[in-house]
Amino acid sequence: MSLTIAIVGRPNVGKSTLFNRLVGKKLALVDDKPGVTRDRRIHAARFQDLYFDVIDTAGLEEADDHTLEGRMRSQTKVAIDEADLILFVLDAKSGITSSDLNFASLVRKSEKPIVLVANKSESKAATEGKYEAWSLGLGEPCAISAEHGLGLSDLRDAIVDAVGKDKAFDNKKEEDTIIQSASVGDNGDDLEEEGCIYDESAPIRIAIAGRPNTGKSTLINSMLGQDRLLTGPEAGVTRDSISIDWEWRSRHIKLFDTAGLRRKSKIQEKLEKLSVTDTLRAIRFAEVVVIVFDSTAPFEKQDLQIVDLVIREGRVPIIAFNKWDLIENCQEILADLHEKCACLLPQVRGLRAVPLSGQYGQGIDKLMENITMIHRIWNRRISTGKLNRWLETVVTRHPPPAISGRRLKVKYITQIKTRPPGFMISCSRPEVMPQSYLRYLSNGLRDAFDMPGVPIRLSLRTSDNPFVGSAKK
């Protein structure tokens, strides 16, 4: 069974910096402002010769349970319960505070092994804080600097001593099976063979995106059947993208909760800019993006811009009309919403849109059925023979226009990518091919090969002319 380590402590002591150091990637947002981390984040780590799962947590604060800070503390308590070992982090520069004393008592009650980590120990100013740390009653402090990578060998030894060698090394696995290295912003898979088989054993990467306060985290909690993510009436509760593994009808799913995207003109603070960057990274890494609309106020300008962003990134967009439990005259409203989808989002004909209620768990199976269906289409490979028989038919029915008195010729088509489907068309004078004709071909491909709701990429190439460059006789 995998070793799980939780990083806990009061706000702004460097927990997320240590988390990033352990996983070897800048996954967690880091800022000088306290309280950046809110949800608990779990990731596989390789720390020297140790392999384990590490949990980043929100800073522990004194607050009532019903407040945002109180709900954040509840998430941290869950992480403590899930962990085999606790890294209790303090700021050696600022010394011990009353909050450190109170929360040290909290983690002691868990009866879990604890390693006391005196972070920010790179300067002489931290010397007194390291000595003060003994007063917490958590044993000898391990002095490190997560930012500068100092003292990490001592931390490794402290972890092994705390859990024992058997537990520390029991779950050691090959690096390539523990550390997942996927290319963020993948532009698709090049096709070299005719028959690309759809792999149902591979996980589907799904990002949940949308404006702030549309119910994204509530929807994921409902999908999981547990309060995994922090939710609340406050807008902008989620700050960074959280990855969660899930299984639906025996299909492995990797979910990404993301921070709400506001209009660019409203984004002023550095922290929100970091959150937006993290959300965009999650969208590019995902395969399917569920854009959550508030059914009581759908199709705001920002909703449409987010869908357009997903399409431009080549990901599969699916609209989730959330808070459907608040809607009356459901059938009439749904028909109107589908009509608006077709009118306001013509970039992808046949865009999937599903009404649901994240709060009550209604419509989730319908959403997932649409996701698995359209994900298969996104991976579809069409043979060159079928494509060219189709091309001959549509060009005969509607030939390309004449430009400057010379008719354009479309000669050949082949699929060069999946994820999203990408096609190369050989034609004369591609630089003057009208966008209207390309839309005609793109929509024709969707209709003929049953690819509704999926972005399609068309690229044009000049057909080779064997006489170009030949010497005149």
From Swiss-Prot:
Residues 3-167, 204-379 form the EngA-type G domain. CDD domains: EngA1 (cd01894), EngA2 (cd01895). Residues 380-464 form the KH-like domain. GTP 2 binds at residues 210-217, 257-261, 322-325. One of its GO terms (molecular function) is GTP binding. HAMAP family: GTPase_Der. Associates with the 50S ribosomal subunit. GTPase that plays an essential role in the late steps of ribosome biogenesis. This is GTPase Der. The gene is der.
